[in-house]
Structure formats: structure tokens, C-alpha cells
């Protein structure tokens, strides 16, 4: 839900942002590009962080990136600040997506498909609710800043839940499933067929 909620907030609010700070659509595109750049980079590093520091760490880090990103984004007035903070939001969203999928796959090995479908259904619910709520708030005169700040009422409790939630212990990997360190990862990537 959180991923769909935050991911779809930008689409509804970008026209209000451009109007509020006097940006053109080119600068708006730069802002949106920055979020997806953060998301893209998170797809490479979230799994590695989960392997090195644990699944809980990567999920909590995702929540913290979202909190800091939203606070900064809602307070921004210069393009560089918007770009930096929405990049942080993108990192949080990418880490959240990968960490959530990773945890669900590990916990529900027998019924992965069912639980991954549920995860995506909740993404869809967040994606549907967000434009409706954000559009309503914009229509009654709220600023995009207020809308992003209100999103903290969703992000903060979920992040606190990530912190206090108990995660099942990973089973000890056998020799075939041992963790890959960074040097091994570079070797695998640089091998030629």
C-alpha cells in the first residue's frame, strides 16, 4: 500500500508544484526523472544490502529514506533540492519494493504467487486512493507541501512497524546457496560469455 500511495502522489501534485514554484514542464520532468533514477539504483543495492546487513535493515532504511525524502521534498523551493529529495524518495520506494518482495518470497515459499499477488493488490489500492485524495485536497485549497506532509501520517507508523516487527530468522545457507560478497558480484558481472 505504502509503495503505491507514495509512488502515485507525484503525478497528481506535479502541476501544483510547477505552478507554486514557477517551474516549467522540463524542470518537472527532471524532478520525476530523479525519482526513477533513485528507484533504479535501489534495485541494484537493496538486495545487496539485504544480504549484507539483513532484510529488516533494508526495509527500515527504505522507510527512513521515504521519511527524510518527503520532509525535504515538502520543504523544497529550488530545483536542486526537489531533485535531491525526490531521488531519496525513489531510493526508498525501490528499496521498499525489493525488500517487501524478498521478505514475502522468503516467508511464503509454498504460496509465493498468492502473496506476491496480494502485495501487488495493495500497491493497486494505494495507487487508486492517492490521486483521489490528493486531487480532493488540491481542489479544496491545500498546497502540495501539505499533502506530502500528510503522507507522513502513513509513512511514519509503517516505518515504526518495520522497526519493531519480528522477522523470521533466515535458515543457514548450504554451500550451494552461500552469500555472494561484493568481489564475487563484480567477477560475475565482468565475466564474458
Residue ranges and their predicted role:
Residues 8, 35-44, 127-128:
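Residue-level signature of mid-helix packing/kink "hotspots" within the transmembrane helices
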Residues 41-80:
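Conserved MFS/SLC helix-loop-helix module at the cytosolic interface between two early adjacent transmembrane helices
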